[in-house]
């Protein structure tokens, strides 16, 4: 993330400085005197590149493509190169600070970067990708990549995981202003990446999976949202702390992260739906991957959360209220429902299964991992809904090793 942002900033600065003297004012007559502008659009059909307002140098505008439009950013700081290639790319940048290179591909729209800090490169490739720009404050990473109609609006003020990477109509969740955002969508059909609000950096969004939904509560950081295929929505990560990388590979492994405070052993890799909720006060491992309609639970503000679910079919996971970190959302299982009672920790919500909803964890304490796989198992705490299983998370203050992988149809309960 940092390397990408740094590289984008360096490219924008270097291109702006190199093009300051090379670009003649004949190509940009509307350019205000005293402020250099990047090179206007080159090649393509009907390229439009309105000049940037006075203030700082601008990178080169869109090149090639059919009817690319790249309005220059308002005065303030240099802007990276606008969209290149593609059909009808539009990327008007807001005034203020430098922006990374806009979208490249077909009908891609680069999200506007609000003034304040540099923005990462916008979506590349794909059909009709849309990436609304982030609010002013800090740089934004690249928007969603691939995926089918993923949606993930993030809450303003704090960092969010990387937006969904899917195939069609993927929308990256907004990262609140103030901090950098992950890389925008690349490829795919009709990806949309609404920009994050100012505040903190956003991690990479969900990849793969069908119709994952996981809106996080504002106030604290959330791990990377679900990565699924169709209509995946990355859960919003509330502002607060950094987010870990989302799970990759394995067969729907669950490794609920430990509460912030102390280190945790390596989370489960491979295997069948292993479950292991971590105690509060310590760092959290990567969240669930796969599952049907699993929604990643929101991580309350204040502590970091592991990465959310990736893949799976239509994962749904309502996020927990703010207060303490929550384990990974549900994986596996058939329609598990188990909202935990407020005030106590709840394990990671169910992962996988059909139309499973992870119970929200009330603010105050972390939540242990809920059901994983099996048919409607019942755990100890939750009063509400269905036959959910919710094992209690271990007390805070002690490190937790890797969770035990379950053997057989029923999920293993985490250590207390």
Curated annotation (Swiss-Prot):
Entry-linked InterPro entries: Pro-rich (IPR026086)
Domain of life assignment: Eukaryota
Keywords for this protein: Glycoprotein, Phosphoprotein, Pyrrolidone carboxylic acid, Repeat, Secreted, Signal
Leader peptide range in chain numbering: 1-16
Region (Disordered): 19-416
UniProt-annotated location(s): Secreted
Region (15 X 20 AA approximate tandem repeats of P-P-G-K-P-Q-G-P-P-P-Q-G-[GD]-[NKS]-[KSQ]-[PRS]-[QRS] [GPS]-[PSAR]-[PSR]): 53-360
Pfam families: Pro-rich
Any GO CC annotation of this UniProt entry: extracellular region
Phosphoserine PTM positions: 24, 52
Polar residues bias: start-end ranges: 19-28
Post-translational modification: N- and O-glycosylated. In head and neck cancer patients, O-glycosylated with glucosylgalactosyl carbohydrate moiety. This modification would require prior hydroxylation on the lysine residue. Proteolytically cleaved at the tripeptide Xaa-Pro-Gln, where Xaa in the P(3) position is mostly lysine. The endoprotease may be of microbial origin.
Cystine pairs: none
Keyword NAD in record: no
Primary location recorded for the protein, binned into one broad class: secreted
Record's compositionally biased regions (Pro residues): 48-104, 112-165, 177-227, 239-289, 301-351, 378-416
Glycosylation sites: 168, 230, 232, 272
Compositional bias annotation for Low complexity: 34-47, 290-300
Modification Pyrrolidone carboxylic acid, positions: 17
Chain positions of Sequence repeats: 53-72, 74-93, 94-113, 114-133, 135-154, 155-174, 176-195, 197-216, 217-236, 238-257, 259-278, 279-298, 300-319, 321-340, 341-360
Note: Peptides IB-9 and P-E are the same peptide.
Protein name: Basic salivary proline-rich protein 2
Species annotation: Homo sapiens (Human)
């Amino acid at each position: 993330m940092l390397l990408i942002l740094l590289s984008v900033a360096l490219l924008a600065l270097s291109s702006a400085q190199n093009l300051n003297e090379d670009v003649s004012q004949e190509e940009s007559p509307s350019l205000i005197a005293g402020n250099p502008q990047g090179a206007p659009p080159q090649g393509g059909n009907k390229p439009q590149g309105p000049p940037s307002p006075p203030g700082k140098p601008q990178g080169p505008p869109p090149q090639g493509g059919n009817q690319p439009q790249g309005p220059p950013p308002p005065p303030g700081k240099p802007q990276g190169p606008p969209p290149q290639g593609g059909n009808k790319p539009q990327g008007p940048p807001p005034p203020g600070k430098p922006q990374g290179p806009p979208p490249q591909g077909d009908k891609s729209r680069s999200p506007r970067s609000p003034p304040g800090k540099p923005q990462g490169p916008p979506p590349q490739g794909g059909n009709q990708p849309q990436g609304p720009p982030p609010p002013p404050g800090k740089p934004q990473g690249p928007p969603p990549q691939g995926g089918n109609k993923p949606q993930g609006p993030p809450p303003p003020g704090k960092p969010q995981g990387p937006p969904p990477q899917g195939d069609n109509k993927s929308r990256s969740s907004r990262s609140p202003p103030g901090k950098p955002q992950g890389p925008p969508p690349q490829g795919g059909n009709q990806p949309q990446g609404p920009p994050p609000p100012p505040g903190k950096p956003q991690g990479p969004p969900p990849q793969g999976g069908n119709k994952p939904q996981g809106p996080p509560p504002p106030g604290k950081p959330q791990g990377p949202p679900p990565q699924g295929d169709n209509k995946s929505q990355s859960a919003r990560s509330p502002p607060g702390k950094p987010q870990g990388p989302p799970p990759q590979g394995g067969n729907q492994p669950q490794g609920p992260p430990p509460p912030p405070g102390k280190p945790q052993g390596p989370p489960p890799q491979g295997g069948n739906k292993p479950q292991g909720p971590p105690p509060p006060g310590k760092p959290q491992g990567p969240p669930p991957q796969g599952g049907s309609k699993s929604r990643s639970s929101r991580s309350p503000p204040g502590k970091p959360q592991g990465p959310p679910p990736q893949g799976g079919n239509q994962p749904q996971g309502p996020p927990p209220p703010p207060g303490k970190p929550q384990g990974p959302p549900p994986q596996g299982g058939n329609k598990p429902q188990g909202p935990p009672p407020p005030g106590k920790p709840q394990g990671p919500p169910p992962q996988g299964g059909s139309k499973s909803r992870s119970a929200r964890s009330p603010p105050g304490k972390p939540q242990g991992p809920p059901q994983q796989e099996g048919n409607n198992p019942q755990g100890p705490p939750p009063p509400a809904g269905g036959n959910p299983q919710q094992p209690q998370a271990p007390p805070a203050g002690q490190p937790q090793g890797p969770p035990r992988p379950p053997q057989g149809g029923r999920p293993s309960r985490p250590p207390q």
